[in-house]
Amino acid sequence: TFFLSNNSNENELTQELVLNWLTRGENEPLKRFNARIGFIRKLAKYLNAAGYKAYVVPQNFSNPGSAPRRPYLLTDKELGEFFHEVDMVTSDDPFIPLLLSTAFRLIYTCGLRPNELRNLYRENVDIISGTIKIVNTKYHRERFIAMSDDMKKLLVSYITIRDVAYPESKYLFPDKQGNMYPSSWYQDWYKKFFALIKPDCPKEELPYVRVYDLRHRFASAVLHKWLDKGENIQNKLPYLQSYMGHKNIASTAYYVHLLPENLLKASGVEWETFKKMMPEVPEWED
């Protein structure tokens, strides 16, 4: 429809037309934007091979609007309201409210990638030591994470019921068939809870949010805590990198970018040092 309404010459896919179509939407995920780039490149190559004129965007094409989406970091107030809504949810399946309450808190308090949570095995949780073995990671590298005492207590309560309800399932958070829920299931619930804490905001005006934002919120909270204690963030980053399972320190350094500028200045953080460390595209958008 876009091309039919904007192309005055039906026999040519012009550069202007292609670039206009590739303008990235304000809330468009980077993956979707990159997918559109790939699609239009292949289409243009096909048209050229068929004898038509078509502009082929460069392999390393970037657009002024292609900056990675900035995560939506819940404020302390919003975070409290969010988990209140999670805890108030009802369902025909009495197990689901407990699962959601535990799963979302585990992502937030441990900084897990949503897919790491979905792939967690029951056998990888040590309720005695309060540690979790993460095996199905983004870069296929195992790591161990320690839970807070409060998170450990909540998870123990959850597991007590889970082991009775789904003794045959290998997953920590199983669906009714004992398999893992799809990522869209968690995303739909996350957006629903977020909308509930924004009752005065029209649905079409709600910011784009996703479960992954809880992981970003965790990292931001850790950095805030270090700054409050007067810690040297640059020296502490390797610890956060290891805990969160980042492949390189640059991806961890990018979280400093999410902190308020006035907080960084007040804490004496040398921003230019971190800018040199950061990748052009943050790892979480991969």
List the predicted regions and their residue ranges.
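Conserved catalytic core of the tyrosine transesterase superfamily
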Residues: 1-286
